[in-house]
């Protein structure tokens, strides 16, 4: 019985240590989430402005008839996917949702590896796809908690350049969209070619009319459209990172709560075992006393 009590006590102490670790990780993820949410809000100021400029320009008659490849659809022979996962685990179902969505998409729409190209951001996704012999063209590992454009700009530019060079004919970003601290949604968002933009982004009094573009429209579009697309992709990365921190916080909170429940159950088990041991000792003492009479 003493050995059993000792084992239960050791389990309680071990679980308490685990609970302290998961609680600390929860607080760290919570702090990261607050920073990421603020970064997302700050970026939206820039994203909204460039989206408005691009929308106004494309809805004007200044660019009608442009043959810019970023605006023109072509027969789809190959599709590019930017897939955003985490670099580490302990984030609940964050990665599994993305990887399942990608596998379903590839199974449904592609029969050969040459039909698609994956640009992987995050070690979990890179390892997953490579282990299955899938077509990973580029990868980025070790993404910062609050990624700067300098860190991700190169791989984003590579993706846009691959489309412009017709290495694939359309480009999607697959990521977890942050809804709130408890919820995220998988998004498969088309980036290229640029589709019809939201009419609400351009009001009647803002649509460009009666202006000339200098030096010419093609030069303007050549500069603006990649910048616009890259900003959308960067925004998706920030959004995904925010969802990752939220998932990490929720996972660690769940782990902490589960540890507390285990501790409570073990404590009850320990007290019952201790009570049984005491009762057994009293019974033995009484029996011994009776034997001496």
From Swiss-Prot:
A Pfam family it matches: ATP-synt
The organism's taxonomic lineage, starting at the top: Bacteria, Bacillati, Bacillota, Bacilli, Lactobacillales
PANTHER family: ATP SYNTHASE GAMMA CHAIN, ATP SYNTHASE SUBUNIT GAMMA, MITOCHONDRIAL
Name of the protein: ATP synthase gamma chain
Cross-referenced InterPro entries: ATP_synth_F1_ATPase_gsu (IPR035968), ATP_synth_F1_gsu (IPR000131), ATP_synth_F1_gsu_CS (IPR023632)
Gene Ontology terms: cellular component: plasma membrane; proton-transporting ATP synthase complex
Subunit structure: F-type ATPases have 2 components, CF(1) - the catalytic core - and CF(0) - the membrane proton channel. CF(1) has five subunits: alpha(3), beta(3), gamma(1), delta(1), epsilon(1). CF(0) has three main subunits: a, b and c.
NCBIfam families reported in the protein's UniProt record: ATPsyn_F1gamma (TIGR01146), PRK05621.2-1 (NF004147)
Signal peptide: none
One annotated GO molecular function: ATP binding
Family under the similarity heading: Belongs to the ATPase gamma chain family.
Major location (coarse): membrane
Protein topology in the membrane: Peripheral membrane protein
Keywords annotated in UniProt: ATP synthesis, Cell membrane, CF(1), Hydrogen ion transport, Ion transport, Membrane, Transport
Any GO BP annotation: proton motive force-driven plasma membrane ATP synthesis
Source organism per UniProt: Streptococcus agalactiae serotype V (strain ATCC BAA-611 / 2603 V/R)
Encoding gene (name): atpG
Top-level division of the source organism's lineage: Bacteria
Function: Produces ATP from ADP in the presence of a proton gradient across the membrane. The gamma chain is believed to be important in regulating ATPase activity and the flow of protons through the CF(0) complex.
Protein localization: Cell membrane
């Amino acid at each position: 019985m003493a050995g059993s009590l000792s084992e239960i006590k050791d389990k309680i102490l071990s679980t308490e240590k685990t609970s302290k670790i998961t609680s600390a990780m929860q607080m760290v993820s919570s702090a990261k989430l607050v920073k990421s949410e603020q970064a997302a809000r700050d970026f939206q100021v820039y994203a909204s402005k460039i989206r408005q400029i691009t929308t106004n320009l494309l809805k004007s008659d200044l660019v009608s008839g442009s043959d810019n490849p970023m605006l023109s659809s072509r027969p789809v022979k190959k599709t590019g996917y930017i897939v955003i996962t985490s670099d580490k685990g302990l984030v609940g179902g964050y990665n599994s949702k993305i990887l399942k969505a990608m596998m379903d998409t590839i199974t449904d729409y592609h029969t050969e590896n040459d039909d698609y190209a994956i640009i992987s951001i995050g070690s979990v996704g890179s390892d997953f796809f490579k282990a299955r012999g899938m077509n990973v063209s580029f990868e980025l590992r070790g993404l910062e908690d609050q990624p700067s454009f300098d860190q991700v700009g190169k791989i984003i530019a590579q993706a846009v350049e691959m489309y412009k060079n017709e290495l694939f004919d359309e480009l999607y970003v697959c990521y977890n969209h942050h809804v709130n601290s408890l919820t995220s949604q998988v998004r498969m968002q088309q980036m290229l070619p640029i589709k019809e933009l939201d009419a609400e982004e351009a009001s009647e009094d803002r649509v460009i009319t009666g202006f000339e573009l200098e030096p010419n429209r093609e030069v303007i579009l050549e500069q603006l459209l990649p910048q616009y697309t890259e900003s959308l992709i960067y925004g998706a990365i920030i959004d995904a990172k925010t969802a990752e921190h939220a998932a990490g916080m929720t996972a660690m909170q769940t782990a902490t709560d589960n540890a507390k429940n285990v501790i409570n159950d073990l404590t009850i088990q320990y007290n019952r075992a201790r009570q049984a041991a005491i009762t057994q000792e009293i019974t033995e003492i009484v029996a011994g006393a009776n034997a001496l009479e």
